[in-house]
């Protein structure tokens, strides 16, 4: 899973958890992202969370499920819930950040929730 920011050429991507360095924390990652987007107008702050869920099958087969949560990066942190970039991420169609959503609201639209639901649907068919 990772956060892709349009203005940063889809970075930090898979490096999201360590964007500010190998020993960084969520606060450092969020501070760096805000600094990198300083002065960037809202219409150019598009972003998405992406989750890729892969399964290696016996005999060499493999399956991949992908989930995305599109949105944009806010200009300041808001909310106490969630983790990581949630206080900065405004999901499409929402006026609140991911950190301001309940766990159930976030799961219904999240990239991880979408990927896992697709996997479970496939698993039930097997």
Q: Could you tell me what each predicted segment is?
A:
Residues 1-126:
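Anionic-ligand binding patches
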């Amino acid at each position: 899973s990772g956060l892709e920011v349009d203005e940063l050429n889809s970075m930090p991507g898979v490096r999201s958890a360590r964007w500010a360095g190998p020993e960084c924390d969520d606060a450092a990652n969020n501070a760096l992202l805000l600094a990198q987007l300083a002065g960037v107008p809202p219409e150019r702050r598009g972003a998405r969370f992406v989750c890729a869920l892969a399964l290696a099958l016996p005999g060499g087969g493999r399956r991949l499920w992908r989930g995305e949560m599109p949105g944009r990066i806010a200009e300041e942190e808001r909310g106490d819930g969630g983790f990581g970039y949630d206080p900065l991420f405004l999901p499409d169609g929402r006026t609140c950040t991911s950190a301001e959503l309940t766990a159930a609201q976030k799961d219904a639209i999240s990239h991880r929730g979408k990927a896992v639901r697709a996997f479970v649907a496939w698993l039930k068919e097997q």
